[in-house]
UniProtKB/Swiss-Prot annotation:
Chief place where the protein resides: membrane
Entry-linked Pfam families: LolB (PF03550)
Name used for this protein in its record: Outer-membrane lipoprotein LolB
Ranges annotated as spanning the membrane: none
Amino-acid biosynthesis found in the keyword field: no
This protein's GO CC annotations: cell outer membrane
Lipid attachment, kind S-diacylglycerol cysteine: 27
Oligomer and partners: Monomer.
Signal peptide: 1-26
Chain residues carrying a lipid of type N-palmitoyl cysteine: 27
Length: 210
């Protein structure tokens, strides 16, 4: 009887170890290589812009702070973009449970942790109705990469690395800091501040997956 117990324990331990190895291997394959950008690195602005413009699919994870109408909220987020399709999951200290905003060029939906789902033609209308604030998703797929929306008027400033430090477009004032090189090719920011009217978004990007 004791031998059977020992064998069972050994098998269970081996199974747990195998699961951990598989999990760690899976995580390793999804993590994108990230390196620091030194102050001496100077990027070619045109090449960088076109490389980032071609980047159509990614996942960004981090933290967002929202200040609006003298109120402040915060949440963790997972933001996925695949061409024109996007998904933004907000969870944590938001105060309303977790929510997910999904959409494309035709429609947008918002689902909460209670199983309720609402749809609208655009994310701004839906988020203002349900949250009182909004994320400019139409521009975000460009701005989160620190590039301007193509063919729309904008003003910008560059830092010593020849990367965007400030951008004004579509009524938004955006500032960038703490860049890192992702996948050995893409200089991407880790801190973004976006302001328009009485709304300010502070976005911290903890990890990129490309």
């Amino acid at each position: 009887m004791s031998k059977l117990k020992i064998d069972t324990k050994r098998r269970f331990s081996l199974l747990i170890a195998l699961v951990l190895i598989i999990s760690l291997s899976s995580c390793a394959t999804t993590q994108t290589n990230v390196t620091a950008i030194t102050t001496k690195t100077v990027f070619n602005q045109e090449t960088t812009y076109h490389n980032l413009l071609k980047l159509k699919k990614w996942q960004a994870n981090g933290f967002i702070g929202i200040i609006y109408d003298n109120q402040a909220e915060s949440a963790n987020y997972t933001y996925l973009q695949d061409g024109d399709n996007f998904s933004i999951k907000l969870y944590g200290p938001l105060g309303i449970g977790s929510i997910e905003i999904k959409g494309d060029t035709n429609s947008v939906s918002l689902a909460n942790s209670k199983g309720q789902k609402l749809t609208a033609k655009d994310a701004k209308t839906l988020m203002l109705e349900q949250l009182g604030w909004y994320v400019p998703v139409e521009g975000l797929k460009y701005w989160i990469k620190a590039i301007a929306i193509p063919n729309i008027r904008q003003t910008s400033e560059l830092n010593t690395n020849n990367l965007l430090s400030k951008l004004s477009q579509n009524g938004w004032s955006i500032s960038y800091s703490n860049y890192q090189l992702v996948d050995s090719k893409y200089p991407l920011p880790t801190k973004i501040r976006m302001s328009r009217d009485n709304l300010t978004l502070k976005i911290v990007i903890k990890s990129w997956q490309i």
